[in-house]
Regions:
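Metal-dependent active-site segment of extracytoplasmic phospho-/sulfohydrolases and closely related
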Residues: 1, 208-229
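N-terminal catalytic scaffold of extracellular/periplasmic and nuclease hydrolases
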Residues: 1-119, 124-137, 144
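The substrate-binding groove and active-site-proximal loops of carbohydrate-active enzymes
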Residues: 46, 155-159
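Surface-exposed acidic, glycine-flexible loop patches that form ligand/cofactor-binding
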Residues: 58-61, 101, 138, 172-178, ...
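Hydrophobic anchor at the start of a short beta-strand
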Residues: 69, 182, 227-229
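Active-site His/acidic residue clusters
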Residues: 80-85, 152-155, 177-181, 185-216
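Phosphate/oxyanion-binding active-site loops and adjacent basic polyanion-contact surfaces
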Residues: 91, 160-168, 206-210
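Active-site regions of oxyanion-processing enzymes, predominantly non-cytosolic
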Residues: 137-149, 167-189
Length: 229
């Protein structure tokens, strides 16, 4: 990197206590549930309270107010962080169940990996299904919801696969043209995975993509003046 990180140029920084309801350290499911619903829960739970009662997510609340919602992840779209926006289940690892919940959720666009957890033949009636990077160059109307599944699980970083930045910009452009208000969550999922693997080079490459995504989001917000990042 030969420049200051774009994420470091965001003027406000906050801190949070990330312990989950039942543990001194959280996992992704409990953490994502906390910011998606406003409530702490047990590790492994997705948008359920500790007694397994359903918690409304920010996507579900905004849907009632007429907002469009989307998510982007370089992991599977059924992974814990994106799943906390739409799934209600007591195990983050029930990927096929979570995939079914996504298909029946308020999410209008979901882009990421996770193709192995979906029956593509069954979802064609309700969703535009994208599986190739080139499809992000196309325009789609709002007659169907849209799901992009660009790898079997997490998206391999290669020239044949879309980056977080490319997927995020696709959603921004689509929403900006065709809806009056929207919510978007975008996750650089594999920064974390590279950390688990002690792979510094991969972590840097993944973070570069994440940081360029942040740059584009900052530019969008500054030009739009009606969007909160």
């Amino acid at each position: 990197l030969d420049h200051r990180l774009f994420i470091d140029q965001i003027p406000y920084v906050g801190t949070s206590l990330t312990h989950s309801y039942n543990n001194a350290y959280t996992d992704s499911a409990a953490a994502a549930t906390a910011w998606s619903t406003g409530y702490k829960t047990k590790n492994r739970y997705l948008s359920l309270d500790p007694d397994k009662k359903i918690l409304d997510t920010i996507v579900e609340m905004l849907h009632k107010k007429g907002y469009t919602s989307g998510l982007v992840a370089t992991s599977s779209v059924t992974h814990a962080t994106p799943a906390a926006l739409y799934a209600h289940i007591d195990s983050r690892y029930e990927y096929k169940n979570i995939a079914n919940q996504l298909m029946n959720s308020s999410i209008d666009i979901a882009l990421g990996g996770g193709k192995e957890f979906f029956d593509l033949n069954k979802i064609n009636d309700t969703h535009y299904v994208l599986t190739e990077k080139e499809s992000l160059q196309l325009n789609f109307d709002h007659s169907k919801k849209l799901i992009g599944l660009f790898d079997d699980d997490g998206i391999e970083r290669s020239n044949e696969k879309p980056t977080q930045r490319q997927m995020t910009n696709f959603v921004l452009n689509h929403f900006n043209k065709q809806c009056s208000g929207f919510f978007l969550m975008t996750e650089g999922s594999q920064i974390d995975w590279a950390g688990h693997d002690n792979d510094a080079n991969e972590m840097i490459e993944e973070f570069k993509d994440f940081d360029l995504t942040i740059r584009d989001l900052i530019n969008f917000v500054n030009e739009d003046n009606e969007t909160l990042l």
